[in-house]
Amino acid sequence: MKMELKVKPIENGTVIDHISGSKALKVYKILNIEEKLPMTIALNVPSKKGVMKDILKIEGLELTKEDVNKIALISPDATINIIKEGIVIKKFKVDLPKRIDGIIKCTNPNCITNKENIDGKFSIEQKNTLKIRCEYCEKFINSIIISK
């Protein structure tokens, strides 16, 4: 017997779709979403492309440009849907900017940003297989630590 889960559409807010499988909770965490906001988190849902995806629906949330950049770092294929009065008024794919300031922490313990209270500045050197370089110490980082 095939079971289907019905999730009520949101009236006003944001739907983050096509999140890489098992990454919705990481997206939720980096966005610092208020716990009082109604939301639906769907994990490992089959997509039309045959791969697993996650979906995050948050009633009453408007994303900032910084939020979208954070999502792009974690799930570069994610799609953002802005909902007003039950209608999708804007839909777009996230896109990594050429430079990211202040939201990533350098993993090099000798970097000046880790010794003093300085926000990190990073260049996106390669998007398809994420390659990020610290503009202070020039180190390429493999693991992303979101600082804000």
UniProtKB/Swiss-Prot annotation:
One of its GO terms (molecular function) is metal ion binding. Zn(2+) binds at C106, C111, C134, C137. Binds 1 zinc ion per subunit. It comes from the Archaea. GO terms for cellular component: aspartate carbamoyltransferase complex. One of its GO terms (biological process) is 'de novo' pyrimidine nucleobase biosynthetic process. Gene3D superfamilies: Aspartate carbamoyltransferase regulatory subunit, C-terminal domain, Aspartate carbamoyltransferase regulatory subunit, N-terminal domain. Its cofactor is Zn(2+). Keywords: Metal-binding, Pyrimidine biosynthesis, Zinc. Belongs to the PyrI family. NCBIfam families: ATCase_reg. Contains catalytic and regulatory chains. HAMAP family: Asp_carb_tr_reg (MF_00002). This is Aspartate carbamoyltransferase regulatory chain.
